[in-house]
Curated annotation (Swiss-Prot):
Belongs to the intermediate filament family. GO terms for cellular component: cytoplasmic ribonucleoprotein granule; intermediate filament; neurofilament; postsynaptic intermediate filament cytoskeleton; Schaffer collateral - CA1 synapse. Residues 431-463 are annotated as: Disordered. SMART domains: Filament. Residues 130-142 are annotated as: Linker 1. This is Alpha-internexin. One of its GO terms (biological process) is postsynaptic modulation of chemical synaptic transmission. The keyword GTP-binding does not apply. The keyword Transmembrane does not apply. Class-IV neuronal intermediate filament that is able to self-assemble. It is involved in the morphogenesis of neurons. It may form an independent structural network without the involvement of other neurofilaments or it may cooperate with NEFL to form the filamentous backbone to which NEFM and NEFH attach to form the cross-bridges. May also cooperate with the neuronal intermediate filament protein PRPH to form filamentous networks. Keywords: Acetylation, Coiled coil, Developmental protein, Differentiation, Glycoprotein, Intermediate filament, Neurogenesis, Phosphoprotein. Residues 143-238 are annotated as: Coil 1B.
Length: 499
């Protein structure tokens, strides 16, 4: 008894060392990766060590029992040899079992490796499918982002174009204002030139008048000298006539008329001298006044000429400044017009490139949408296949559960639980045995026929119940699959709408 218990404990301990509990075995199976062969070798070595330990323990037990044999005197050498032979057989069997278990464990590890590789491949395929499903949304986000950037650039270009147009309009208004001012200045210049010409004509007239006056003064001086000469000659003639008349009178009455003639001559001389002095003084005063007036007019004319010359010079300087400013504004306007043309050309080129990009992105979006629809159709087909498989699995599971519950509750045989509608397969073994021994007695045959009818009724009821339960299970699974399909379709439509 002690040897058997020890051997059982050693076998169980070695089995536990090999397989462990359920959780340990599952953890080892799930954690087995690329080092599966190494683990199998280590486990085989540990199993061999455990078997060696068990053999040593059993040998110790035999040794103790053999040592006890002289005390008990009940165990002989034949029994010991039989036990050693039995132990050798058990040990060889145990080694074979351990080797077989190690082989099975290696097969299980290889299968786990295969399943892990398949699982990784399926996970990679699932990740690729998810990435493909997520790519349209990413492409849509990229498309929307690029479209927003293009719209922002388009708005910036339009705002820059509007700003350039406003600047161009402002510069055009400034040019128009400067042109109007230039025309006004040119009109003022023409008026100043006309006034200058008029003043020059006045100056010329004044100079001519001065020359005429100078000539008149000269002629008057000459005339005054001639008048003086004529006056002197007349005075001389008068004196001569007076002398002649005085001589003639002297001949008549020299004594009486001599004082009267001298006084009369003195009076006449005084009158002529006073008249000549008055004429000379009046001529000098008129000449002086006329000369002063001419000098004043000449001074005024020279001042006006100088002012008009300064004004003309100022007008010329302003005109040159305005012409320079107009030329600069004209150059700025031309440069701005060139910039506007360049901006319009660049804007049109950018708009064309953006439209090309938008068309390409729309084509990519349509392609991704079509690919997404194809993937959705494939996913829907796979989902339909999965739901059909789930329906079948659920139906078989419900059938198996129903069979197990009926088998556990009732003591019927498995043949009575056959869901086939043929009643000939639903007969119990005792009915078949009774049909074979039907020719023994007529009473027994009738009784057996009644039992067969009852059994067939029971079997038909059971088959009808199984069929009803199967139909109920199918209806439940169909309803659940329809609900899941509807929810999946709604999710896919929502995701497609979001995309």
């Amino acid at each position: 008894m002690s040897f058997g218990s020890e051997h059982y404990l050693c076998a169980s301990s070695s089995y536990r060392k090999v397989f462990g509990d359920g959780s340990r075995l599952s953890s080892r199976l799930s954690g087995a990766g690329g080092s599966g062969s190494f683990r199998s070798q280590s486990l085989s070595r540990s199993n061999v060590a455990s078997s060696a330990a068990c053999s040593s323990a059993s040998s110790l037990g035999l040794g103790l029992a053999y040592r006890r044999s002289p005390a008990s005197d009940g165990l002989d050498l034949s029994q010991a040899a039989a036990r050693t032979n039995e132990y050798k057989i058990i040990r060889t069997n145990e080694k074979e079992q351990l080797q077989g278990l190690n082989d099975r464990f290696a097969v299980f590890i290889e299968k786990v490796h295969q399943l892990e590789t398949q699982n990784r491949a399926l996970e990679a395929e699932l990740a690729a499918l998810r990435q493909r499903h997520a790519e349209p949304s990413r492409v849509g986000e990229l498309f929307q982002r690029e479209l927003r950037d293009l719209r922002a650039q388009l708005e910036e270009a339009s705002s820059a174009r509007a700003q350039a147009l406003l600047e161009r309009d402002g510069l055009a208004e400034e040019v128009q204002r400067l042109r109007a001012r230039c025309e006004e200045e040119s009109r003022g210049r023409e008026g100043a030139e006309r006034a200058l010409k008029a003043q020059q004509r006045d100056v010329d007239g004044a100079t001519l008048a001065r020359l005429d006056l100078e000539k008149k003064v000269e002629s008057l001086l000459d005339e005054l000298a001639f008048v003086r000469q004529v006056h002197d000659e007349e005075v001389a003639e008068l004196l001569a006539t007076l002398q002649a008349s005085s001589q003639a009178a002297a001949e008549v009455d020299v004594a009486v008329a001599k004082p009267d003639l001298s006084s009369a001559l003195r009076e006449i001389r005084a009158q002529y001298e006073s008249l000549a002095a008055k004429n000379l003084q009046s001529a000098e005063e008129w000449y002086k006044s006329k000369f002063a007036n001419l000098n004043e007019q000449a001074a005024r004319s020279t001042e006006a000429i100088r002012a008009s010359r300064e004004e003309i010079h100022e007008y010329r300087r302003q005109l040159q400044a305005r012409t320079i400013e107009i030329e600069g504004l004209r150059g700025a306007n031309e440069s701005l017009e060139r910039q506007i043309l360049e901006l319009e050309e660049r804007h049109s080129a950018e708009v064309a490139s953006y439209q090309d990009n938008i068309g390409q992105l729309e084509n990519d979006l349509r392609n991704t949408k079509s690919e997404m629809a194809r993937h959705l159709r494939e996913y829907q087909d796979l989902l339909n296949v999965k739901m059909a498989l789930d329906i079948e699995i659920a139906a078989y599971r419900k059938l198996l559960e129903g069979e197990e519950t009926r088998f556990s509750t009732s003591g019927l045989s498995i043949s009575g639980l056959n869901p086939l509608p043929n009643p000939s397969y639903l007969l119990p073994p005792r009915i078949l045995s009774s049909t074979t021994s039907k020719g023994s007695a007529t009473g027994l045959s009738l009784k057996k026929e009644e039992e067969e009818e009852e059994a067939s009724k029971i079997a038909s009821k059971k088959t009808s119940q199984i069929g009803e339960s199967f139909e109920e299970i199918l209806e439940e699974t169909v309803i659940s699959t329809k609900k899941t399909e509807k929810s999946n379709i709604e999710e896919t439509t929502i995701s497609s709408q979001k995309i």
